[in-house]
Amino acid sequence: MALELEGQGVFESRGLPVLYCGVGKVNAAYALTRRLADYRHAGRALPHVLNFGTAGSRRHPAGTALECHAFVQRDMDVRGLGVPLGATPFDADIPLRLEFPPVFPQLAQAVCGTGDSFATTECAIECDVVDMEGYALAKVCWLERTRFTSVKWVSDGADSTAGADWQSNLHHAAERFLQLYEHLEEKDS
């Protein structure tokens, strides 16, 4: 999760480890890379990275949990150099859209558009939800060849009321994330 606010203490109250990566792509990439490096330095296998977070959506109503199976950058715009929207220049080995196998069949699948802005207007790139960390986390996992799963709780409509809606939906999101985590733990046991 990006912020302790998103977790509402529900994971910690059960003694579960959580990495809060901070807001935005740079903070997310740094925090996860550092955590994975700690695993490597300790001689441990890389974990299945499970990202829970909130997202805005103009396609799905607030209160919907979605599994993001694909990730794009909604704010990478170098079209002036002839590079497609969402593509990082000179990153030829990285696909425009990062995809991962689904883990939660009970959830609808979604494409997550990540950018370093709190979205309040329509996106220029095709995506179902918008967030500020998903693509960065997905790219780190793709590069490190470790499993990645991301579930987003639609907290707002990515519109003019997004800020207030986001805050009012945090507790519901945290409880749903815990349910999904516990279901995954049971499944893996």
Give residue ranges: language-model regions:
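Glycine-rich phosphate- or other oxyanion-binding loops that anchor nucleotides, phosphorylated ligands
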Residues: 6-188
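Structural motif
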Residues: 1-5
